[in-house]
Amino acid sequence: MNPASPFATLTDRIDWQKVDGLVPAIVQDFQSSQVLMMGYMNPEALQKTLDTQQVTFFSRSKQRLWTKGETSGHVLQLKNIALDCDQDTLLVKVNPIGPTCHTGTVTCWDGDAQEESQMVWLHQLEQLLAERKNADPSSSYTASLYARGTKRIAQKVGEEGVEVALAATAGDKEELICESADLMYHLLVLLQEQGLAMNDVINKLKERHK
């Protein structure tokens, strides 16, 4: 962490007396915005998180610092951290390496209790498409597309774009939805093949919206 970073003074801004020395830290996937878990940090845990760029908590049961993934390898790589307006809660945005929950699930919350947002699902689809990049071409349609390279994938994006336009021109809404899904899928594959992600596109849209 750069000493000149605004995060360097974060520890001093927290109202530690108000939180009895342990500040709640809500952990969120920086790409999908899915809430992954909640833990507690004392000043030492927060400082270690900032210094190592891996999320560390204070374990209330073990009464010691605990770096997430220290035994499983499923660490939480720090991407951003923010203090709320009351100076008593942290929002920690991370890149999770593997499942976050000790049960092996992505999040520590019950899947039925946490409604899955479209962006979370889209991110999970991107992860699946990324995994298929090095898979046997005979194992799936996606893997076979990667094997045929940029030209073929780009051709499919163009073909599906035409199908979307034709469906819209015909006024067939159901077909428009289906063809749009095909277009989105092939576009995501193309982005992955080029080392990009939907977040790159969203960030460009945000930039243009300013």
Curated annotation (Swiss-Prot):
Answer yes or no on keyword Cell cycle. Answer: no
Q: Where is this region: Phosphoribosyl-AMP cyclohydrolase?
A: 1-121
State the Pfam families in the record. PRA-CH (PF01502), PRA-PH (PF01503)
Q: Name one GO molecular function term.
A: phosphoribosyl-AMP cyclohydrolase activity
InterPro entries per UniProt: His_synth_HisIE, HisE, PRib-ATP_PPHydrolase-like, PRib_AMP_CycHydrolase_dom, PRib_AMP_CycHydrolase_sf
Q: Which is a Gene Ontology cellular component entry for this protein?
A: cytoplasm
* Keyword Phosphoprotein recorded: no
Catalyses which reaction(s): 1-(5-phospho-beta-D-ribosyl)-ATP + H2O = 1-(5-phospho-beta-D-ribosyl)-5'-AMP + diphosphate + H(+); 1-(5-phospho-beta-D-ribosyl)-5'-AMP + H2O = 1-(5-phospho-beta-D-ribosyl)-5-[(5-phospho-beta-D-ribosylamino)methylideneamino]imidazole-4-carboxamide
- Compartments, record wording: Cytoplasm
Pathways per UniProt: Amino-acid biosynthesis; L-histidine biosynthesis; L-histidine from 5-phospho-alpha-D-ribose 1-diphosphate: step 2/9; Amino-acid biosynthesis; L-histidine biosynthesis; L-histidine from 5-phospho-alpha-D-ribose 1-diphosphate: step 3/9
Q: Give the family from UniProt.
A: In the N-terminal section; belongs to the PRA-CH family. In the C-terminal section; belongs to the PRA-PH family.
**Which NCBIfam families would you find in this protein's record?**
histidine_hisI, PRK00051.1, PRK02759.1
Q: What is this protein called?
A: Histidine biosynthesis bifunctional protein HisIE
